[in-house]
């Protein structure tokens, strides 16, 4: 009887896995809704209890997400992000140097802030620089997006995928990654990607004749009304929060708690209002995380993960080629659509 139930659970879990992969690729419905359909379905089918299906809502990584959304909102809403972006003006000497400056700054910012928010801030900054310096703006917009995506792999908080992987490691009792563990690969990847675009990739970027940009992107928002002290508080809170996360083990304070100390300072001092803080929380990212975590839990509990692992071992042999395993992993990881968030 136990074996029959196990086979049933594996079949149901694999069915939802295939469903998630297909729906993530087709995007016929929002990714976050797909993830929650999976979580609810795994509970209704009996694979997971309600507590297991929705425990992601109280996961420490979700708590961390929420706090970082608030800190990031202060960084963007006070205009600090635009001030940082304007630093690129100093490097607007030629096309190659400008691409390097834009991509490195965008990548580093997206390593700690919302990738979408970073790109949204950098686009009008770069359009303004191109207009002033006589550069073709179409050469620089795509590198911004790629840099934001690559920069998300610099730190633990750079991308939801990083947090999902870390949560699954903790769930399996395998420990957790350090704050900059991803950066050991992510930072070199950002540097190499930047150099590629600066010296080779730029030749393949479209050269569309420059035309008058949309008024919404022609200039930055006006932050002159924002008190200077708010900018200082927003910047210092972000820097100190990141520092606390880096030295998590030394100070004995978890990432989530450090982030919430910063978020509370932001709201308590009035840098942004309570309503602005609440609006900054991206529920789509939260729901995507919760649903993905539920699927990961089901893969372990049902034995579906072990089943897939055994199939791969049987196909590749007891001592599979590491390159073959890497190819299988990359194929699996590139099936779902990865969003910049």
Region roles according to the model:
Residues 166-177, 248-251, 310-317:
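Inter-helical loop and helix-membrane interface segments of multi-pass membrane transporters/permeases
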Residues 6, 12, 97, 132-146, ...:
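Juxtamembrane and boundary regions of transmembrane helices in multi-pass small-molecule transporters
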Residues 4, 340-341:
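Short hydrophobic transmembrane-like helices used for membrane targeting/insertion
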Residues 1-66, 70, 184-310:
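Hydrophobic transmembrane alpha-helices of multi-pass small-molecule transporters
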Residues 25-28, 93, 134, 176:
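Helix-loop interface residues and adjacent transmembrane-helix termini in multi-pass membrane transporters
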Residues 33-38, 115-122, 142, 154-158, ...:
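Hydrophobic alpha-helical membrane segments of integral membrane proteins
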Residues 20-28, 105-114, 146-156, 244-250, ...:
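Transmembrane alpha-helix interface/packing and boundary motifs in multi-pass membrane proteins
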Residues 33, 40, 44-138, 280-285, ...:
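Membrane-embedded alpha-helical segments and adjacent helix-loop junctions characteristic
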């Amino acid at each position: 009887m136990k074996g029959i139930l196990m086979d049933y659970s594996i079949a149901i879990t694999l069915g939802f896995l295939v469903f998630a992969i297909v729906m993530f690729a087709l995007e016929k419905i929002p990714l976050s809704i797909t993830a929650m359909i999976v979580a609810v379905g795994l509970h209704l089918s009996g694979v997971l209890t309600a507590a297991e299906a929705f425990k992601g809502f109280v996961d420490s990584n979700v708590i961390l997400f929420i706090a970082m959304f608030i800190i990031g909102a202060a960084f963007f809403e006070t205009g600090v992000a635009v001030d940082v972006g304007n630093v690129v003006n100093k490097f607007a000497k030629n096309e190659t140097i400008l691409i390097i400056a834009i991509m490195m700054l965008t990548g580093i910012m997206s390593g700690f802030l919302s990738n979408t928010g970073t790109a949204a801030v950098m686009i009008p900054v770069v359009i303004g620089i191109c207009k002033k310096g006589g550069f073709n703006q179409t050469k620089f917009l795509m590198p911004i997006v790629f840099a934001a995506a690559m920069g998300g792999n610099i730190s633990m908080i750079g991308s939801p995928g990083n947090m999902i992987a870390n949560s699954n490691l903790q769930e399996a009792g395998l420990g957790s990654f350090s704050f900059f563990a991803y950066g050991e690969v992510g930072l070199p990847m950002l540097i190499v990607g930047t150099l590629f675009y600066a010296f080779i990739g730029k030749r393949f970027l479209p050269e569309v004749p420059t035309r008058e940009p949309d008024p919404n992107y022609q200039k930055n928002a006006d932050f002159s009304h924002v008190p200077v002290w708010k900018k200082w508080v927003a910047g210092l809170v972000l820097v100190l929060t990141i520092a606390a996360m880096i030295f998590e083990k030394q100070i004995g304070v978890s990432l989530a708690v450090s982030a919430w100390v910063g978020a509370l300072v932001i709201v308590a001092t009035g840098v942004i209002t309570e309503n602005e803080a609440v609006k900054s929380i991206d529920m789509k990212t939260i729901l995507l995380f919760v649903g993905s975590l539920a699927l990961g839990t089901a893969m372990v509990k049902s034995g579906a993960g072990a089943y897939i692992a055994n199939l791969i071992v049987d196909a590749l042999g007891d001592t599979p080629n590491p390159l073959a395993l890497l190819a299988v992993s990359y194929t699996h990881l590139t099936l779902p659509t990865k969003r910049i968030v």
